[in-house]
């Protein structure tokens, strides 16, 4: 599982000209599910997204001291299978490491459900749709989180 996590002042996602998800201060999460992922990876990734200290303390330095939960921030979660694009061969990315849509959608929805259990406001895009994402980055702060399925070749514990 891969998540690109971005600290934002605001973010919104539009499908067919209609805003389907919009947040203020918080985190924009671009989420990709691998062929080897199971529900086991979701708990770790959810906890990491909610607990990473990416926000400065109010009135303090820019040093990140607070998590999204500490600031009662908002989350915009967008599915993005292209995070598993393999560009090592040829001129067209291979997406063979991305989970099939039906598997990915199930795990994506479970991930969103787990994030919502935090009590924070969680908005989403539309799984599988062509989306326009507008982001006002804050910092910018952008990180790539990765958690491979237990027992897979790339397991990073």
UniProtKB/Swiss-Prot annotation:
Gene3D superfamilies: D-tyrosyl-tRNA(Tyr) deacylase. GO terms for biological process: D-amino acid catabolic process. It catalyses: glycyl-tRNA(Ala) + H2O = tRNA(Ala) + glycine + H(+); a D-aminoacyl-tRNA + H2O = a tRNA + a D-alpha-amino acid + H(+). Its main location: cytoplasm. GO terms for cellular component: cytoplasm. Its EC number is 3.1.1.96. It comes from the Bacteria. It is found in: Cytoplasm. InterPro entries: Daa-tRNA_deacyls_DTD, DTD-like_sf. One of its GO terms (molecular function) is tRNA binding. A motif (Gly-cisPro motif, important for rejection of L-amino acids) lies at residues 139-140. It holds the Pfam family Tyr_Deacylase. Keywords: Cytoplasm, Hydrolase, RNA-binding, tRNA-binding. PANTHER family: D-AMINOACYL-TRNA DEACYLASE 1, D-TYROSYL-TRNA TYR DEACYLASE. Belongs to the DTD family. Homodimer. A Gly-cisPro motif from one monomer fits into the active site of the other monomer to allow specific chiral rejection of L-amino acids. An aminoacyl-tRNA editing enzyme that deacylates mischarged D-aminoacyl-tRNAs. Also deacylates mischarged glycyl-tRNA(Ala), protecting cells against glycine mischarging by AlaRS. Acts via tRNA-based rather than protein-based catalysis; rejects L-amino acids rather than detecting D-amino acids in the active site. By recycling D-aminoacyl-tRNA to D-amino acids and free tRNA molecules, this enzyme counteracts the toxicity associated with the formation of D-aminoacyl-tRNA entities in vivo and helps enforce protein L-homochirality. This is D-aminoacyl-tRNA deacylase.
């Amino acid at each position: 599982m891969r998540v690109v996590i971005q600290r934002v002042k605001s973010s919104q996602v539009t499908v067919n000209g209609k805003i389907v998800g919009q947040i203020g201060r918080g985190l924009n999460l671009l989420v990709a599910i691998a062929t080897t992922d199971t529900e086991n990876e979701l708990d770790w990734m959810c906890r990491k997204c909610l607990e990473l200290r990416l926000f400065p303390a109010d009135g303090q330095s820019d040093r990140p001291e607070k998590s999204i939960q500490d600031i009662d921030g908002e989350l915009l979660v967008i599915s993005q299978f292209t995070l598993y694009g393999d560009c090592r061969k040829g001129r067209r990315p291979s997406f063979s490491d991305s989970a099939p849509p039906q598997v990915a959608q199930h795990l994506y929805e479970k991930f969103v459900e787990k994030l919502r259990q935090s009590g924070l406001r969680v908005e989403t895009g539309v799984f599988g749709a062509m989306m326009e994402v507008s982001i006002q980055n804050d910092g910018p702060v952008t990180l790539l989180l990765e958690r491979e399925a237990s027992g897979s070749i790339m397991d990073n514990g």
